[in-house]
Amino acid sequence: MDNHGILESLLFTAGDEGLDEKQLLEILDISKDQLVELIENYSSHGLIIQRFGTTYVLTTKKEASMYIEQLIEQKSQMKLSQAAMEVLSIIAYNQPLSRSDIELIRSINSDGAVKTLIAKGLVEAKVVNEQRSQQLITTDLFLNVFGISNIEDLPTTEEDDEEMDAFFSNLVNQKGENND
């Protein structure tokens, strides 16, 4: 693989954080001038390499923004299965918790629902307090989708029934069913 391909792979893997110039020079074993030349000659159909200070990030070209916005809009209208909704509510109200905790609560294997929630970006697995198993927590996208600013804004049994009904109506609407 040539240095263009390696550079692209490294920046893709680094994601939004990008890679520092020093890291790239060390990994690619090239000079700063060679790195600048690689970046200037980088060509991809939909991607560019942008520099922010000493950090390089692989980003999409501006010409693709309209299509990316459509994708984001579609994702915001995501539909979830009943099982995924159950698992999501269990995680939201009890986080952090492990997959085995969810199975204990639901009395059924929930791996498929968990994988769906992770793939949709609503849940992520993290190591919390050095526990052996990864713990599942909700993401900022979860908060955004459900219109709350922090997890404490979730309705509780102490809140009035109208607020609870509105929240769960929103859940059902996200799932794609009607209340009729």
From Swiss-Prot:
Q: Name one GO biological process term.
A: cell division
Which superkingdom does the taxonomy of this entry point to?
A: Bacteria
- Tell me a GO cellular component: cytoplasm
Read off the NCBIfam families from this record: SMC-Scp complex subunit ScpB (TIGR00281)
What does the protein in this record do? Participates in chromosomal partition during cell division. May act via the formation of a condensin-like complex containing Smc and ScpA that pull DNA away from mid-cell into both cell halves.
Name the protein family.
Belongs to the ScpB family.
Q: What's this protein's name?
A: Segregation and condensation protein B
- Annotated organism of origin: Staphylococcus aureus (strain MRSA252)
Gene designation:
scpB
